[in-house]
């Protein structure tokens, strides 16, 4: 639906995504891919100046945001030197028309994504030693990463993967978002990265895999320890 009716984008362009982890993040990314263009993913908590820096550095043609991020995005766009050439899409303000959905259901659809050495995504470094740098990743780069993970036998199509790492990092982008597309794994979202919400998601959704970093597993440890300490 996003690709057919929301995104007006030529090939070899950029679409910037500034929003929290949610299904619409994935719809936005793949709708950009379906135009044979590249997705730029940045932290949903980016402030207006950080967003403006990315705009001036990459010159995207469309920005996807949410109600949660729209204020900062609008403030950045207002200062952007090419603000007249960019389209803003707030995914929370999209109205899904049933008639159009019915048309899509009857379509033969295959994602027309970038291939080979074509640029598929741009991710920005943290900028701890200076201004963030945009790192362009080709489709081959991402595909190699996915296949390397899958060949380890950690995941298969039966898995329910908990999405707790922000999608603007390469690990969750490949091991959660893109792995889901290629191998039909399922994604479970949490609204807040806190031990209670994570434990609730694990229980309710029969999560079988978690892509994490030490800080995430420290949350698990702290949550379990608090529950144990509360009993004594």
Report each predicted region and the residues it spans:
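Conserved AMP-binding/adenylation subdomain of ANL enzymes
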Residues: 143-160, 167-232
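Conserved coil-to-alpha-helix start sites within the AMP-binding
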Residues: 19-30, 45-48, 165-182, 193
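Short hydrophobic alpha-helices that are characteristic scaffold elements of the AMP-binding
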Residues: 30-37, 57, 178-182, 221
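Conserved AMP-binding A3 loop
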Residues: 120-146
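ANL superfamily adenylate-forming
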Residues: 68-116, 224-232
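Conserved ATP-dependent adenylate/AMP-binding module captured primarily in the ANL superfamily
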Residues: 5, 44-75, 145-162, 194-208
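Conserved AMP-binding/adenylate-forming
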Residues: 2-46
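Conserved pre-ATP/AMP-binding loop-to-beta segment of ANL
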Residues: 105-124, 131, 154-160
């Amino acid at each position: 639906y996003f690709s057919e009716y929301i995104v007006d984008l030529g090939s070899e362009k950029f679409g910037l995504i500034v929003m929290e982890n949610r299904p619409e993040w994935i719809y936005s990314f793949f709708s950009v891919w379906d135009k044979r263009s590249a997705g730029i993913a940045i932290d949903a908590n980016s402030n207006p100046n950080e967003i403006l820096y990315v705009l001036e550095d990459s010159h995207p043609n469309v920005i996807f945001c949410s109600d949660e991020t729209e204020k900062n995005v609008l403030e950045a766009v207002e200062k952007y030197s090419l603000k007249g050439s960019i389209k803003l899409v707030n995914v929370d303000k999209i109205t899904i028309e049933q008639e159009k959905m019915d048309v899509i259901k009857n379509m033969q659809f295959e994602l027309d994504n970038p291939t080979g050495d074509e640029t598929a995504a741009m991710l920005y470094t943290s900028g701890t030693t200076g201004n963030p740098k945009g790192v362009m990743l080709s489709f081959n780069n991402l595909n190699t990463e996915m296949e390397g993970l899958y060949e380890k036998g950690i995941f298969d199509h039966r898995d329910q993967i908990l999405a707790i790492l922000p999608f603007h990092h390469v690990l969750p982008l490949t091991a959660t978002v893109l792995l889901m597309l290629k191998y039909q794994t399922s994604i479970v979202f949490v609204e807040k990265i806190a031990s209670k919400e994570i434990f609730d998601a694990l229980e309710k959704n029969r999560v079988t895999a978690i892509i994490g970093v030490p800080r995430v597993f420290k949350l698990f440890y702290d949550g379990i320890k608090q529950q144990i300490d509360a009993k004594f």
